[in-house]
Amino acid sequence: MSSPLECAKYLLSAHTTHQLPADDGSEVAFAGRSNAGKSSVLNTLTRQNALARVSKTPGRTQQLVYFTVTPQRYLVDLPGYGYAKVPKELQIHWQTFIDSYFHQRQALRGLVVVMDIRHPLKEYDLQMLAYARQRGLPAQALLTKADKLGRGQQAQTLQKVRNELTKHFADHINIQTFSSKSRQGVEQLHTVIETWLGLARLA
């Protein structure tokens, strides 16, 4: 059976909260530092190579990008963060926008925080997970580019990050490895997101 996420289509890009769709559906947001592989995750999940643009210049995503899965069910690509070439004023605008989104958006059903498995749990990652915790939302910590490490190193990093997350958030954050290249962890993430959005598998 194919995943309903494969039906995703671009809907809109929003620079302010006023441009967001009506707040009466269900949506899952994807957050991550610039160059963590967020666009590749979205493209892999949907089996669409060009759904989310993979920029050669990290930090270019300057808005919330909405993709429609089914009517009133969305995937949301949040602005990448933490890249030095982005002007300070723009970083402040993003932060204000993201703060407002997390505190006001009732349609939000869950958060996927994308982290490069070689550089996990930066300050921004913890901040995003804290947002989810404060709202009582489920969150999935995604250790991407897992193919860059051997199985032993993957397991070691996974356990280390799990211990750190437990210290900060008790057992409220789920964690998994993921690779767009080998498709490792794709089915696991499909299941998580489909459950959050209340989607049924397509025969």
Swiss-Prot record:
GTP binds at residues 32-39, 59-63, 77-80, 144-147, 178-180. Keywords: Cell cycle, Cell division, GTP-binding, Magnesium, Metal-binding, Nucleotide-binding, Septation. GO terms for biological process: division septum assembly. Mg(2+) binds at residues 39, 61. It holds the Pfam family MMR_HSR1. GO terms for cellular component: cytosol. Residues 24-199 form the EngB-type G domain. GO terms for molecular function: GTP binding; metal ion binding. Its cofactor is Mg(2+). It comes from the Bacteria. NCBIfam families: GTPase_YsxC (TIGR03598). Belongs to the TRAFAC class TrmE-Era-EngA-EngB-Septin-like GTPase superfamily. EngB GTPase family. Necessary for normal cell division and for the maintenance of normal septation. This is Probable GTP-binding protein EngB. It comes from Xylella fastidiosa (strain 9a5c). The gene is engB.
